[in-house]
Structures are given as C-alpha cells and as structure tokens.
Amino acid sequence: MAYQTAVAVPRSGNVWIDGLTDGYRWGTSAENPAIGYTFIGHTRDLPGGEFGGYPSLGWSEQERQLLLDAMQGIADVSGLRFIDRGDNNDDNVELWFYTLDRRDADGSYGFAYTPGSDSDEGLVAINRSMYQTSDFKPKHSIAPGSFYGITFLHELCHAVGLKHPHDSGLKQQPRFPGLTKRSNQYRDSGMFNQNAHPFTQLTYVDKGARNGYVPTFAADHGFLQTLGALDIAALQWLYGINPNASSGRDVYRLPLSNTEGTGWRAIWDTGGIDRIDGSLAEMPVTIDLRNATLGQDDAAGGYPSSAEGVFGGFTIAHDWNGVDLTESAGLCIIEHATGGRAGDRLIGNQASNRLRGRRGDDVLYGGLGGKDRLIGGPGRDQFWVEAESGSFAIVRGLQPGLGQVGFWVTR
C-alpha cells in the first residue's frame, strides 16, 4: 500500500464539525481505507538517540493498549482503518508513535501533527513524565476515563485530522460558537456549553467545565473514555461512517460509582434492539434515548444519561449517513431504557421504545414516534405522552390514586 498523502477537506456547513476539522485528512478511500502506524521503541542506542528526528522512551503494555484502543474506537465509528507496520518502521507509515520526557515534550501532555501540516504530519508524542516518575513509578492513573488517560486518544485524533475547538486550524477553520482567540481555553465552554467533556475530548475544558458531568480536579475517573458525539460526527465527515458497528442486541449499563476508570462514552450503534440499563441503581438515574442533534443548541453533543452523583454514563451520537446532516439514517438508534430502584427520569426517541421505570417515583416521557410502551412500578409514577398527531403509547403499571398520565409538547 502506497503512502496516503493528505487531501483538503471541504467544509460541512455545520459549526461543530467545521469547528473540529483541521482542513485536511489522509487521502483514504472506500477501496483503500487504511493508514499504517508504527510504535517507536527506546532510542537510546540509536545514532543520536533518535528515530526520525525524535527520541523515544519505548512503550509499556498499558500505553500501547491505550493507542490500540483509540485506533479501534475511530475505526468503530468511521471508514478509517489502521494497519500495523511493525515497530521502528519508516516504510509506508502515516502515524508514528513516540513517548517523551517533560523536556522533549516542552512541558505539554503530548502533541501531534495533523495531515497536511508539515513533514512531521502523523507524528504522535506522549509526555510520559506527566503520569510517571523517572524511575517508572506511577504518579497518576492513565485508565480510560481518567484525566490523563484521554491524552492518547486526543493526540491520535489530531494525527488523523481533528483540531481543538478553540483553534482556527490550518485552513482558518471556525472555532466553536462563542469562542474567540481571546477565550480562556481551559474554562470557556462557548455558546451552548459544547466545548467541554462529555461532548468532545478535543477540548481543553475538562476539569474546568463545571457542568456537573465531570470532576473539578484531575481525577482518575469522570472524563471521556472514548470519542465524544461531536468527535464522532467530525471523523465521519472526514472518512465516512462505519455502518456495521455494534449491530447486535447490546446493553449499555450505567456506571454506578466513581471508581478508577469510570467515565463517559458516546454510543455509535448501527443495529439490533438495544437498551441503556440502570436497573441496579439505588440512586435516581436519567436515561435519555435521543441522539445528539448537531444543531445550534444545548443538545448538539448529546443528551447525557447517568446515575445521580456519578461522573460517567452515555450520550448517543447523531444518526446520519456521514453526508446529509438533515436526514436520519435509521442506524444509530437505542430503543429501550430500564430504570432502577429510585425516582428515575426516562425519555424516549422516535423509535418504538420500551421505557421501564421499576421502583421509585419515576417520570417517563414517550410518544415521540413508533409504538411506545411506558411501564411503571411501585411508586407515584408520571407518564407523559407527546401531544402530537400520530403519537402512540401504551401505559402500564399506573398505580390507582398515585400515578398520573399527562401530555407534553416538544415543538
């Protein structure tokens, strides 16, 4: 396979996608979708202590796995594929992975060069000294979902064509709405508060988000484990969608404690009858089955589903074909939601949903499309049905004299 050169990317016209794309991508195609990668081992015994102009400290199994998982995460949602060219290789390689110390990384957590930037395009460097001492003892967790763990996916995304929401990029791409070159890049979440976890991991607004979804310190949990819904849309604009991801009957279980590795995931699921499950929760849960809108609104990057007090859960990516943002592709749909043992809030979508509240004083919203089943349980449940022509919902488990049925309008 020949080296994939960088090609220019047209703007999508969507403020979030254009706010994350740097202007170029690798020149892959449906017939030739892959780029090659190599891990650079320890360079101490090489001439000048460098490989390709940079030193490297080698890779632990955990570090290597974080980048392998990051590549798989991109392949799961997009048409881009990755081929292992073997370690310390410079033949037909687009992505070069290095680990550096604080001095060589110039104090940053890591850095990467986007396609089309310069001769170092595709280089990804991780600053190991941010999370490990010089005698190889851990300083901070790099588990997925941790403050430092997201660095690996973040830098890889740069190397395939994504930028920060607060930057203008190689081709003067727009920033996210509400951001300027004078914005505080660590605190300003912009208009609609989308420049933050859990909506994009390309942001610098992580522990500074103060949005209730993530911790306010560099914790070992609570941040994105995967691509955010906005990242997914941007990658799909660059490389197309993966129409075959998670096509079976999948259950997405809400995390129920703030332990190491708890975090946020954006769901891209293209088939089967699927469910977000909070059935083991003792605390109230919110489960919202609606997709990220990608519109200029607070739900552009998704509607978070989580257990109360837990920094982690799910959003659901925008349902589209990677070309036309205005049409639902009928692919990324989660049909069912199950609550727990407290007062839960379950919200359906345009599909035929089964919303099961179980115990507690639950509030269930249905009737947005399809043939919904709203199932209560012991408690003072509320059942709200969309008051539009064609709405349909079956209500079960209404406790006489306790529960109530109402109608709501979404537009």
Name the predicted role of every residue range.
Residues 292, 296-364, 368-369:
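Extracellular repeat-rich scaffold modules on cell surfaces
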Residues 99-125, 188, 195:
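Catalytic zinc-binding patch centered on the HExxH motif and its immediate surroundings
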Residues 55, 137-152, 170-188, 194, ...:
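Acidic, glycine-rich calcium-binding repeat modules characteristic of RTX/beta-roll
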Residues 48-89, 153, 271, 277-282:
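Zn2+-dependent metallopeptidase catalytic core
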Residues 34-36, 40, 44-45, 187-190, ...:
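GD-rich hexapeptide-repeat beta-solenoids
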Residues 77-79, 156-173:
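Catalytic Zn2+-binding segment of zinc metalloproteases
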Residues 38-42, 113-143, 201, 311, ...:
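Active-site scaffold of zinc-dependent metalloenzymes
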Residues 1-59, 69, 106:
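Disordered inhibitory propeptide/activation segment of secreted metzincin zinc metalloprotease zymogens
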